[in-house]
Amino acid sequence: VKQGLYNNGGDGYVVARLATAVGIEVTLLAQESDKPLPEEAALAREAWLNAGGEIHASNIVWPESVDLIVDALLGTGLRQAPRESISQLIDHANSHPAPIAAVDIPSGLLAETGATPGAVINADHTITFIALKPGLLTGKARDVTGQLHFDSLGLDSWLAGQETKSQRFSAEQ
């Protein structure tokens, strides 16, 4: 599991903990930062460590016997090209022979537009939650998301009652 610093990184800790709980061997690589994690991500990190999980620096030598890379580096908040250190991790993952599953959105793909302003994960599968992000269906998404999987997490009826920011305009007015 390759994981980042924000809420998508929290998702990476959850995936790692759940995989370990069912007997899957996990190596978790995390970016170091002076900034504190958001509360939910920090709780997920703590749960991973309390379950006996280890966190490895992202610059370790990767094992060749990797069966799956889970991309939880960058999430839907990305607005620009990934920093150089993240770009190097993305390039390393893309060059590894193991398949890649992206959590929510491939790192480097902009959630609103589907643009790829820099390095981007070339996922074999992308698992997204709650709502389909426009960037998963437009721009370069077709080239980098692989097979797209969606789960509303049971929020369908709640989402149906929400107002959107979008408005329709009539040419007749």
What are the residue ranges of the model-derived segments?
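A cross-family phosphate/adenosyl-ligand binding-site feature
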Residues: 2-69, 74, 79-84
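YjeF_N-associated NAD(P)HX repair module
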Residues: 66-173
